Amino acid sequence: MGFYQGPDNRKITGGLKGKHRDKRKYEIGNPSTLTTLSAEDIRTKDRTLGGNFKVRLKYTTTANVLDPATNTAKKVKILEVLETPANKELARRGIIIRGAKIRTEAGLAVVTSRPGQDGVINAVLLKNESQGS
């Protein structure tokens, strides 16, 4: 079943509007990716408009974590998802999105990339709580 993101044919009162055109291909959407932790990395490659591609990260084990103190990045294992400011239900289900706070082997970090669209998890190590593993 497709995800239609165009205008609906209902008025605020609930009545039907007159349909003046058909649905267009650029008005279709996709379900959310909902990246979670797993034993291996699984990515899918979706074609978008203009022949471009989005790499969707379905499952992952690692993140690229930047340490702002030393300005170095390293690939470390993700241990758990602690909280998500967008929705606490996502953190309870272990779903990683942009802005989520994760516990890694290097310490606590905040995700700065969009795993469902970038295909990778980039994060920045938190200063005060880098000892918290």
Curated annotation (Swiss-Prot):
Pfam families assigned to the protein according to its UniProt record, in alphabetical order: Ribosomal_S8e
Keyword Ribosomal protein on entry: yes
Region (Disordered): 1-22
Keywords: Ribonucleoprotein, Ribosomal protein
Family: Belongs to the eukaryotic ribosomal protein eS8 family.
A GO BP annotation: translation
Subunit note: Part of the 30S ribosomal subunit.
Entry superkingdom: Archaea
GO molecular function, one term: structural constituent of ribosome
PROSITE patterns to which the protein is assigned, alphabetical: RIBOSOMAL_S8E
GO CC annotations on file: ribonucleoprotein complex; ribosome
Record flagged with keyword Ligase: no
Annotated protein name in UniProt: Small ribosomal subunit protein eS8
